[in-house]
Amino acid sequence: MSLPDFTMRSLLDAGAHFGHQSHRWNPKMEPFIFGTRNNIHIIDLAQTVPLLHQALKAVSDTVARGGRVLFVGTKRQAQDAIADAAHRSAQYYINSRWLGGMLTNWKTISASIQRLRKVEETLQGGGSGLTKKERLMMSRERDKLEKALGGIKEMGGIPDLIFVIDTNKEQLAIKEAERLHIPVAAILDTNCNPDGITFPIPGNDDAGRAIALYCDLIARAALDGIARGQGAGGVDFGEADQPPAEDLPAADLPAETPEPTTAVTEAYEAPAEAFELLTAPRGAPDDLGKLPGIGPQIVKKLNDAGLYHFWQIAAMTPEDAAKTDHDLKLGGRIERDGWVNVARSLVAA
């Protein structure tokens, strides 16, 4: 894989160049403003393109070193895109509300995460010994904790880089990251303050299409980092169960027929390797912790059950996934967190 490609045209089509009304601006953003049209500031995308590329490279390098990226976007327009991008790239996210101390008071946050796990285990076990009211109260507690901490419950520590949509709304997250010297990549609209942002990306932080584009690019950069990390770790793609997928430039694709795309889709839907459990790993086991929502305890549970490699999970049919989830009492994690799709991306990387 390689860093995701994008063009100024793709940014224009997404509306990334539209800023806020000219009277709602932060003077510190003046260097990134191209001009004004109908009292709306226009962002200079000629600067956005290289700055966005720098941010993508930083994300890829961070993940390639084994680092963790935290996606942060709690505004309504960003919530779904943030969660989807984090799931697809096996990273972490906050899309509900930033709780004070999420980074600077990780010890307390970890205690809340442990409580969430304990509640989940109790409810997955049927809640025996609890009254109906106690089960209801526990379910509500689980839902509340899951909403606040579900995106980071498997993070295992503070992230190595955070990606932020809307620095005005996420000021607390940025201040905590700055205090801990965590690099920040952030989308900066014309009403934002670029101070303290390690990798500034001038762009519209309100339009849904623009937010979706940013998140997709960051997610793909993280997947590139995962692939590079596997290569640096000695993964021999020549001996892989499935060959890595290569992205062909548009000019190299057939002009009319979509057959190659269809073939790739079918390959994903019906992988060559059939799903099977192993008595021992074939060579070095994969780092299953790269799958979303997986921590050391779940990795051990999967290994004990005979799951060591991404290709095994990628080969799962819906029936295989449901049976494995039931047998290991995973509480619907395989389907909910998209393990199969992420595993297929990692196998193809």
Curated annotation (Swiss-Prot):
Pfam families, per the entry: Ribosomal_S2
Biological processes, Gene Ontology terms: translation
Record's keyword annotation contains Ribonucleoprotein: yes
GO cellular component, as recorded: cytosolic small ribosomal subunit
UniProt xrefs under InterPro entries: Ribosomal_uS2, Ribosomal_uS2_bac/mit/plastid, Ribosomal_uS2_CS, Ribosomal_uS2_flav_dom_sf
Gene Ontology molecular function, alphabetical: structural constituent of ribosome
Superkingdom of origin organism: Bacteria
Keyword annotations of the record: Ribonucleoprotein, Ribosomal protein
Keyword Lipid biosynthesis: no
Family of the protein in this entry: Belongs to the universal ribosomal protein uS2 family.
Protein name: Small ribosomal subunit protein uS2
Source organism (scientific name): Methylocella silvestris (strain DSM 15510 / CIP 108128 / LMG 27833 / NCIMB 13906 / BL2)
